[in-house]
């Protein structure tokens, strides 16, 4: 399994719609609002890196999403 956090900026006035749509994407385990440079964080789980990529791209194409930055968990 591959875990990642996607930091998301939303379009002004589209926050609620974006959060709802992000939460419906398969592989999204948790979605929550944050204060600061980003508006929303989504915790993801995917089978592997090849599965994670399309999942992140799908989130980035959702209505109201204007920017994403993905942080992939590494083993330590």
Label the model's feature ranges.
Residues 1-76:
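A compositional/biophysical signature of low hydrophobicity enriched in polar/charged and small residues
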């Amino acid at each position: 399994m591959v875990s990642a956090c996607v930091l998301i900026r939303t379009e002004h006035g589209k926050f609620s719609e974006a959060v709802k749509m992000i939460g419906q994407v398969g592989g999204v385990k948790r979605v929550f609002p944050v204060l600061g440079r980003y508006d929303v964080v989504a915790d993801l789980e995917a089978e592997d890196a090849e599965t994670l990529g399309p999942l992140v791209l799908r989130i980035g194409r959702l209505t109201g999403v204007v920017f994403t930055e993905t942080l992939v968990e590494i083993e330590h």
